[in-house]
Structure formats: structure tokens, C-alpha cells
């Protein structure tokens, strides 16, 4: 089994090296930041919206200004809720100023994360709701440029909803009641009264727009960022890259939602769950910057003259906290809303892992300890399989001298070598595959844990012991400046600085990986031996920029594997490199 297992590890190692190298050196280099500078765009230019009336269009900003200046451009209603603060623009009843109270921009700053930003500022991101009609003469319905009137209320809180009104020249009266819950969900209840004297068909729509790719876009295969939707229970999504390439999506169904998501945050527009709707993703070119849009349009409803229509939709703007998403899904009835989290193709593992991490964090009081506890639990569950693998490795290591003797005896005669080796396996009762097969089920578990930790918002700004203040950021220490003793930052060196950020935890991870390899049977091929000796160094550099929580998990997992493997090998009477090292140290102390 020795060679088979080594080949498996080599293959996995090389695959990981190739994938990580591709991510770092091909996908990683960020494109030059697309600023919201729009001097070339006429102030009167409007954002084309072919399926919506002219009243639904928003004028493009002629220039980019700071966020506070952009917020002062129109009348606003203050939002003050336990989870969000900000304001709502009366122009278009647009939700374009939302900051998240429970999440700060940086670990050293108590400034809330600014999720939604107004037109004219950097990183425009907003959500809104409107109406459209195919009936001739009704082109003045509520849209992006509509000026709503604040009829009642002054500040939007969970206890004090606000009421907006708008009277269209064509004879329709719109009343919109907006409320917000204790988390991130806004409810928009519209009542439309038809005073036009004729029947009119109305369709309600909702949209989320993001101008340009996010400044902090992750561009990692474990993270999905872009437009996504659930339609009839099925997930549909398109990344920012695909949208930028012109990929447009249109799907119809009943029940679901549309949104634009980033690693930790999402803004989503939610139609009436009982109304058929058509969802669409698209990219709208506007000057030097593109607008990415996820939208829906509900099926038209006929409203006779003199009658009214009631309709309720929702907008979610907040953090992708599992408990909040599940609460919205269960209490409000929004279909599969927890799919906003990128569970990956190993969802049947990542879902229980997230649940366990949440439970463990609550019990232990720290997310870092929850990672260690979950890793230990996985090790315990996988112990029977790992025990068989390590036991087989121990037996293989015990017969290494006999295998070397066979290879020396038969030299280049591969056929006789294989026959003699098979006879040896039979005599010693060794199954060459016994150590390889139990390892295979552990591979998806490792990748599922990686996916879980990379997307867990609970890890963001979560501290650990010692110098780790943020588990979602890279280890801040650096070996090249003696871990902060020398006032020098090598990561700023042009071209190579990115690979010089090697902190203490990546080094610990590399040492545990080397220790694990020392317990394995030595490769008979000198080239394989050199590759294995080099892999811990390679992985130390590769994992250096990774989130500290991931590196700590990997180091802890390696340590548990070393401990487990050492105990099993000693039970089989094998002397390990650790034993040899201890023996040499004791011999030196005795002066022998």
C-alpha cells in the first residue's frame, strides 16, 4: 500500500498546488479598480431599462462624490433598527443607505459596514420596488425617479412604520407602508386605487443593482459572489465575471427571490410568494462602469376602474447570518432563503458543519475554540477509518527492510519484483489497499470544512488566543521581521512581497505537516522523497495569506493526525523518527 498511498498524497498535493497557484497568480491579480468616475457620462443620460417605463429610470450621476454628499442630494427618511441604520430616499422609495450595526468595517474601527450606497457615490448598491403596466397611457407609474410623499411617520423603526403616497397623472393612487424588523428585512405593502376611469393591468417589480465589481471581491472558488435567485425551489446564479462577459439569465416560476450577494452580505428583492414572476440577471453598460442587476417582474393583475389592489413584497439587506436567514425562511415563508449561503457541492456536509460550529461557539464562547472542537469531533468520527489506514501504514513500514531486500535482489526485473512483493504481502497478511481506501472518505470532509470556514461570517473579526485578533484575516506576524521585533514590512516589496507574509501559524502548520510525513514509510524513490520533503515548505508559503482560522484548523488537524498516527505505530512496535530523535537527545544528555 505504501506506494499507492504516497502516489495518492502526491496527486492530491500537486492538485492543490496547481489550483492554489492558478487562484493566486492567474485569478488573483485584481483588475485595475473600476472607479465610479463618470465625467464622460452626460448628466441627463438615463439607465436604459427596456422592460420598464420611462418613469422607472434613474439618471446616471455625472461625477462621483463622497457618500455623505451623495446622501444629501434628495429628501430622506431615517432608518433606526437594532441591526441596521441609515436612510431611505423618497426619490424612487429607494433603499440605498443601509449600514449594519453588528458588523464593523475593520477590527480597529467601530464604523458599521456600509452595505447599500446611493447613486453618485463610490460602489453604488441599492434595492427598490416599483410598478409597470402594458396598458396604453399608463407610463407614469412609480419607478426610480418617482418623488414619493411622506404621508405619516418620521423615522422607520420596528415599532414605527412609515407611509408614502404617490398620485400618478394617469389617475392611479399609490400608498406604500414600509416596515422593518429587528434584523435586515424590510416589508413594502402597497395599495393601488384605480381612479383612472378605465381598467388597467399592473405588474409589480423589484430589483437590486450594483455598479462595478465589489472592491473587496474575494475571487476564490469556495466563495460565490454575483447574482443569484431561487425560483420554484431551484437555485439560479451568475457570478460577476459571467455577468461582465454578457451572460444574461431569465427564468419564470412562483415562489422565490432574487439578489446580489458578496462573501458575507446580500441584498435581495422578494416578490409575493404566491404570484408567478419572471426573474432576470443582466449587465447594463453605462460609461466606464457596468451595473449588475438582479430583478423580478410579477405577472400582471387587472384592476377595474374604481377598485383597489393590495400587494406585499420585501427587501432583505444585511449579513448572511444562518440564524437570521432561517428565521426569515420559516416565519415569513420565503422559499429556500438560507441558500444565500454558498454551501457548495458538498452541502450535505457543510450544512451540519455550520450548525455544529454555531452550537459549539455558543457553548465555548469563542469561534476559534469551536473550530478546534469541531475538528476533534470529526477526527473521533473518522477514527475507525483512519485507524485502519495508519495500521496498514505501520505494517508497511515494518516490512520496509524486506521490501528493500527484494528490490535489491531482483534489480531491474520488475516482474519478479512484483511477484516477490505479492508473496511478501501474502505471508505478512498485508493488504496494499487497506491503508489507501479509508483515506478517500476523509477527502470530501476536509474540503467541506474548508468551504464552511471560508464562508462563515461568524469567523469575521472573531479573535483567538495570542496575537490573532481576526480569524478571517491572515496571521499578522512575519518571520522576516522576527515577528514584529524589527520595524520592517517585507510584504510591501514589489512583485515578491505577497509571498513573504509568512506568520507564526503558517510555520506551525508547516512543522506539523513535516512531522506527519516523518511518521510515514519513507518513499523508496529518491525523487519522491525529495518531493515529500519539499511539500511542507510549499504549503507554508501557499497557506500564508489564507485566513488564520483556516491555517489554525489545518495545523490542529495535522497535530491530531500526528498524535493518532504515532500511537498506532507504537502499538504495532514501529520505531518512529520521533523516537529516534528522543533517543539521540537522551543519549546526548547522558554523555554517551
Swiss-Prot record:
Entry's transmembrane regions: 8-28, 363-385, 430-450, 493-513, 531-551
Subcellular locations according to the entry: Cell inner membrane
Record membrane topology: Multi-pass membrane protein
Gene Ontology CC, one term: plasma membrane
Keywords, ordered alphabetically: Cell inner membrane, Cell membrane, Chaperone, Membrane, Protein transport, Transmembrane, Transmembrane helix, Transport
Gene3D superfamilies: 2.70.98.90
UniProt keyword annotation of Cytoplasm present: no
Entry keyword Chaperone: yes
InterPro entries in the record: Membr_insert_YidC, Membr_insert_YidC_N, YidC/ALB3/OXA1/COX18, YidC/Oxa/ALB_C, YidC_ALB_C, YidC_periplasmic_sf
Any one GO molecular function term: membrane insertase activity
GO terms of biological process kind: protein insertion into membrane; protein transport
Source superkingdom: Bacteria
Primary role: Required for the insertion and/or proper folding and/or complex formation of integral membrane proteins into the membrane. Involved in integration of membrane proteins that insert both dependently and independently of the Sec translocase complex, as well as at least some lipoproteins. Aids folding of multispanning membrane proteins.
Family: Belongs to the OXA1/ALB3/YidC family. Type 1 subfamily.
Subunit structure: Interacts with the Sec translocase complex via SecD. Specifically interacts with transmembrane segments of nascent integral membrane proteins during membrane integration.
Protein name, as recorded: Membrane protein insertase YidC
Amino acid at each position: 500500500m505504501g506506494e499507492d498511498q504516497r502516489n495518492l498524497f502526491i496527486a492530491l498535493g500537486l492538485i492543490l498546488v496547481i489550483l492554489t497557484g492558478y487562484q493566486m497568480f492567474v485569478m488573483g491579480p485584481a483588475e485595475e479598480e473600476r472607479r465610479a468616475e463618470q465625467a464622460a457620462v452626460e448628466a441627463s443620460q438615463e439607465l436604459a431599462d427596456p422592460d420598464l417605463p420611462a418613469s422607472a429610470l434613474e439618471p446616471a450621476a455625472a461625477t462621483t462624490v463622497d457618500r455623505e454628499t451623495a446622501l444629501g442630494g434628495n429628501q430622506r427618511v431615517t432608518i433606526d433598527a437594532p441591526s441596521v441604520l441609515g436612510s431611505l430616499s423618497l426619490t424612487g422609495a429607494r433603499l440605498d443607505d443601509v449600514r449594519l450595526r453588528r458588523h464593523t468595517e475593520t477590527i480597529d474601527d467601530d464604523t458599521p459596514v456600509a452595505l447599500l450606497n446611493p447613486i453618485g457615490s463610490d460602489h453604488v448598491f441599492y434595492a427598490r420596488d416599483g410598478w409597470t403596466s402594458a396598458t396604453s397611457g399608463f407610463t407614469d407609474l412609480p419607478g426610480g425617479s418617482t418623488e414619493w410623499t411622506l404621508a405619516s411617520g418620521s423615522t422607520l423603526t420596528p415599532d414605527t412604520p412609515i407611509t408614502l403616497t404617490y398620485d400618478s397623472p394617469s389617475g392611479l393612487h399609490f400608498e406604500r407602508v414600509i416596515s422593518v424588523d429587528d434584523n435586515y428585512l424590510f416589508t413594502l405593502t402597497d395599495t393601488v386605487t384605480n381612479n383612472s376611469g378605465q381598467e388597467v393591468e399592473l405588474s409589480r417589480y423589484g430589483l437590486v443593482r450594483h455598479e462595478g465589481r465589489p472592491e473587496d471581491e474575494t475571487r476564490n472558488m469556495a466563495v460565490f459572489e454575483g447574482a443569484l435567485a431561487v425560483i420554484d425551489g431551484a437555485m439560479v446564479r451568475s457570478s460577476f465575471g459571467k455577468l461582465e462577459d454578457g451572460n444574461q439569465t431569465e427564468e419564470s416560476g412562483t415562489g422565490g427571490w432574487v439578489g446580489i450577494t458578496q462573501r458575507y452580505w446580500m441584498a435581495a428583492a422578494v416578490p409575493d410568494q404566491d404570484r408567478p414572476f419572471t426573474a432576470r440577471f443582466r449587465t447594463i453598460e453605462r460609461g466606464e462602469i457596468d451595473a449588475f442587476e438582479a430583478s423580478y417582474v410579477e405577472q400582471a393583475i387587472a384592476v377595474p376602474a374604481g377598485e383597489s389592489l393590495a400587494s406585499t413584497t420585501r427587501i432583505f439587506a444585511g449579513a448572511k447570518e444562518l440564524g437570521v436567514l432561517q428565521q426569515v425562511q420559516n416565519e415569513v415563508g420565503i422559499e429556500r432563503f438560507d441558500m444565500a449561503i454558498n454551501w457548495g457541492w458538498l452541502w450535505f456536509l457543510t450544512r451540519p458543519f455550520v450548525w455544529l460550529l454555531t452550537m459549539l461557539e455558543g457553548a465555548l464562547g469563542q469561534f476559534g475554540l469551536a473550530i478546534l472542537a469541531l475538528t476533534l469531533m470529526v477526527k473521533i468520527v473518522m477514527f475507525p477509518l483512519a485507524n485502519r489506514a495508519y495500521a496498514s501504514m505501520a505494517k508497511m513500514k515494518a516490512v520496509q527492510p524486506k521490501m528493500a531486500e527484494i528490490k535489491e535482489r531482483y534489480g531491474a526485473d520488475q516482474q519478479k519484483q512484483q511477484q516477490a512483493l505479492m508473496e511478501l504481502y501474502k505471508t505478512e497478511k498485508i493488504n496494499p489497499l487497506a491503508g489507501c481506501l479509508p483515506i478517500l472518505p476523509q477527502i470530501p470532509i476536509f474540503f467541506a470544512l474548508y468551504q464552511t470556514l471560508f464562508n462563515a461570517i461568524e469567523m469575521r473579526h472573531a479573535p483567538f488566543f495570542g496575537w490573532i485578533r481576526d480569524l478571517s484575516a491572515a496571521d499578522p506576524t512575519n518571520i522576516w521581521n522576527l515577528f514584529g521585533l524589527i520595524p520592517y514590512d517585507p510584504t510591501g516589496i514589489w512583485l515578491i512581497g505577497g509571498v513573504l507574509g509568512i506568520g507564526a501559524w503558517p510555520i506551525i502548520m508547516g512543522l506539523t505537516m513535516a512531522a506527519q510525513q516523518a511518521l510515514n514509510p519513507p518513499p523508496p524513490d529518491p525523487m519522491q522523497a525529495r518531493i515529500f520533503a519539499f511539500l511542507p515548505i510549499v504549503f507554508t508559503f501557499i497557506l500564508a495569506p489564507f485566513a488564520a482560522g483556516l491555517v489554525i484548523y489545518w495545523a490542529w488537524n495535522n497535530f491530531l493526525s500526528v498524535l493518532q498516527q504515532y500511537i498506532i505505530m507504537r502499538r504495532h512496535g514501529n520505531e518512529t523518527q520521533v523516537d529516534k530523535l528522543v533517543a539521540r537527545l537522551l543519549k546526548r544528555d547522558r554523555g554517551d
